[in-house]
Amino acid sequence: MKLLYTDMSQDLTEILTEQASSYAQKGKRVFYIAPSALSFEKERKVLEYLPQSASFDITVTRFTQMARYFILNTSNPKTQLDDTGLAMIFYKVLLHMGDDELKVYGRLRKDSNFINQLVDLYKELQQANMTVLDLQHLDQVEKQEDLVRIFSAAQDLLLAGDFDNQSKLSAFFKEITSGHLDEALSNTVLVIDGFTRFSAEEEALVALLNDKCHQIVVGTYTSQKAYKANFVYGNAYQASVDFLRTLAQTYKVIPDYVTTDKEGNLSFARISRLLESRHDFSTVDETVTEQDKHALKVWEVVNQKEEVAQVAKSIRQLLADGKRYKDILVLLGDEESYKLHVGQIFRKFDIPYYFGKEESMSSHPLVEFVDSLERIKRYNYRAEDLLNLVKSGLYGGFAQEDLDLFEYYVNFADIKGRHKFLSDFTANSRDKYNLDQINALRSQLIEPLDKFLNSRKQKGSSLLKKLVVFLEAVQLPSQMFELSTKASEAEKEQNEQVWKAFTHILEQVETIFGDESLSVDDFLSILRSGMLACDYRTVPATVDVVNVKKYDLIQPHSAPYVFALGMTQSHFPKVGQNKSLLSDEERSRINEATDEHRRLDIVTQINSKRGHFVAMSLFNAASEQLVLSQPQIINESQDDMSVYLKELLDLGIPLVEKGRNRFEAKGDQIGNYRDLLSTVIALNSSHLDLDLDKETQTFWSVAVRYLRKRLDKDQVLIPKVIDDVTTTKVDDQVMQLVFPEEEPLKLSATALTTFYNNQYLYFLRYVLELEELESIHPDARHHGTYLHRVFERVMGDSSSESFDDKLEKAIAQTNQDQPFEILYTEDQESRFSRQILEDIARSTASVLRDNAAVKVECEEVKFDLLLANSIKITGIIDRVDRLTDGALGVVDYKTGKNVFDIQKFYNGLSPQLVTYLEALRQTYKVDADQLFGAMYLHMQVPQLNLSQIGLEKLAAQAHKELTYKGLFVASETEHLTGGNYDLQKTVTYDKEDLETLLDYNIKLFRSAAEVIRSGNFAINPYTEDGKSVQGDQIKSITHFEADRHMGQARKLLRLPKKGKKEAYLELMAKTEEENQMQVSENTISFPVIDHAVRVDKKDQEDNHVD
């Protein structure tokens, strides 16, 4: 064995390539061994350093792959299993064990994470040259017994099924020991590069090969100073020194310090020596130079997005300076959190990149198909799982419209569970749904699915056949083919990989579970676990790309230019954690009890020395320039600076603050035109009225000049940013169809309120007739109808029974009404709602019990009022009461709190009670002095704060809550005094005032009708204070934003509280000619002062929102 080491300023790969080339020239077969994660990069570098750029006698590979070269022709009839197959073996083993057989792991028998941990431990034991019987001295005897029982059963199953139960290196080891490979190995040379430690399995193999091979050359990085030091704990090179010394002592070899004629980057060499001296507590007569500060830079950026953008700009500048993409390497401290930012921003900057990380297949439609299938069975046909299955794009050739209809109905009827999906759908809403069509669709969707999922427990091979029949029934193969025909080349390759993984898993299921009795649940669980564990194999599309990977796999001299992102304390150094079934203490005790070449790794024990060595490798990763960057905020939380970056700052490396506020008139600050375009657009929405300093003005003048030239060259037109949300006039044909000219316009108090809330909301509801998603479950509308029906029956019962008996009978009869019986017996939630409604009915009914002054004239009175033959006002009055003097009044039942507010009425937002009084006036042909008022009765259980109300006042306060609230005629209040009426001065009106209210209400209807007939519906939700919007903005449709479109909101007229009623009445009394209010983009007749918003007619013509 030959041991070599060199400084990190030297290129060890070049040195070892020369060694390999010299042995190859002597006729030796050379295997250049690198760690698995670095074998591809090592192969590229070795080929670059070979004089002839290629050699048939030199093979760059890894230990396991090298073993295959020697045992490839060795007969091995046993079936090979990958990790998915091993997981199936353990699943099968645990399937036959009961919870009581495993004292520690009994509850985890079917947990996929536990099974994956068993697979990892199985492979780790192979790498440690151990068996499960070596797992002595565990914390619990029961734990040891469980693991021995599981692994012994798995080993028996592997032997019985004639599966290969040994690793590639174990098979190679046996072949070497047998002497079959002596001749081949005698002409073999191993060159080992990139290691600072061997696994126990690799260590034993190297020991065996040392006696058989012609030569083994091992090289690593360390300094002469570090290797010769007496004390290396905490040294920057501790990992490699320990590695070298162990090999030297084992094989009685003196390591040789080697160099090349090429001089490395002096700056990185000097910084390495300075850092080394800080860790070995020595002094060096060197300091950081200006050249060093240019070669190694430390950035601090606000967040990850800005950090990646700064790197992208620097890459674009390097390209402008003549560099190639392949000369640039980007390293990440946290791959997962940076992956999205790197992808989005690099694409914006037109930077091709290769992310050297396997991507999970979990988001592919076929994996979602299998996942949904398993979840449907596990959760008994949960609606969301079934809908995910049918919407995967692989389930049958159903039209998207049919799937949308099915989804809409399932959500409406709240279909859950197998029984409901197998039964005919019967729920309907005003015959809105074509149940025949939906049930036919249900049968096509559910029948093949249930036929498979309802299969009894049987052999795995039989279930596989049924699965194939099911997949053909739902046209999965043809749908996969259809998916690929519309895909890009990259997507086609992914589809091919997913399909190959799927069929491979099915083959392994056939092999392992073919004769095993399986339930559908277990069968699908096995498929799901296998598919979710699969990853795409990624290969760069071209060599000339920016490579992106995690930093802890870095080697010195990886690229000329290196950017390391996310170098915060949490990620640099990266602290390894033990997530296996064996704790660190257990591993330590096991290692103490075993002999040489048999060892379990203890990750936490090597964190410190591994972190130091990775840091030194990172600081020497670039040959020209290295940038280390840290964001202040990473993963939405603040993080501290890494200790290694602090050491660099202590040495004199300056901290460069990078950010978008550093404006400079330089090309590298502009980056490329796509980024500049997005920056200009972002700036366009900022505060442009701020004064810019001279430096910033210079930057933007250069940037805009560059952008204009580029846009003119590429003939790119920037669309105008529209700050208005105006609408276009509805087509006359549509208006004629919805509101025929020969018929009066139909309006109700609710429609009028909607109009004055937001005209566009009226357009959506009453012109387009859009509706919100319905539900079979009762909501506030159903609750209100239920209580209405109860009170109708109570008030209409003229029998001699007591009031309480009448109430209970009315509740019982209402409960038996078919619509309510269906609604309120659907499930426990519905029954609970009915119970609450019954309590509300009993509480509210106390208001009706003792009211001798009032007689119920009639209930549920429908009315149609015709105004000037052009407007037809419709509605239903819940109850009409008559006083002993003959005066009439209106009662409207409400489940929520409503009061008559004259301010809201004036602004068109509370016309209901006045409209009902107008209906009484015209229906009964009476004058205003024959009306006593209109009021709301809140149907509720009073809720009182006991901490603010004493027990002695509790009954009175509860009674006060149950009162009629509305507007009353002052002359009739004497008949109402003592009753349950809220007769405050602010809600009592004399005859003249009531006439004013009634006349003004008609003007509200006429003004609204004029706008509706015009077909111009403005997006004008109302605002009370001009600062916030209270009206319905319908943002998802109109894109109305209060901060940008406040000018288009309708501002309500608000008057001081003192004398408010009289002031509003005075305004209402004025003539329509003297008081006009604009409620749309055109000035229309409307009786309020000028508080509306004018919308420029030209803008309306130019900018349309459909």
UniProtKB/Swiss-Prot annotation:
GO terms for molecular function: 5'-3' exonuclease activity; ATP binding; double-stranded DNA binding; helicase activity; hydrolase activity, acting on acid anhydrides. Its EC number is 3.1.-.-. Its cofactor is Mg(2+). Keywords: ATP-binding, DNA damage, DNA repair, DNA-binding, Exonuclease, Helicase, Hydrolase, Nuclease, Nucleotide-binding. One of its GO terms (biological process) is double-strand break repair via homologous recombination. InterPro entries: ADDB_N, DNA_helicase_suRexB, P-loop_NTPase, PDDEXK-like_dom_sf, PDDEXK_AddAB-type, Restrct_endonuc-II-like. Disulfide bonds: none annotated. Gene3D superfamilies: 3.90.320.10, P-loop containing nucleotide triphosphate hydrolases (3.40.50.300). It comes from the Bacteria. SUPFAM superfamilies: P-loop containing nucleoside triphosphate hydrolases, Restriction endonuclease-like. It holds the Pfam family PDDEXK_1. Despite having helicase-like domains, this subunit does not have helicase activity. Heterodimer of AddA and RexB. The heterodimer acts as both an ATP-dependent DNA helicase and an ATP-dependent, dual-direction single-stranded exonuclease. Recognizes the chi site generating a DNA molecule suitable for the initiation of homologous recombination. This subunit has 5' -> 3' nuclease activity but not helicase activity. Belongs to the helicase family. AddB/RexB type 2 subfamily. This is ATP-dependent helicase/deoxyribonuclease subunit B. It comes from Streptococcus thermophilus (strain CNRZ 1066). The gene is rexB.
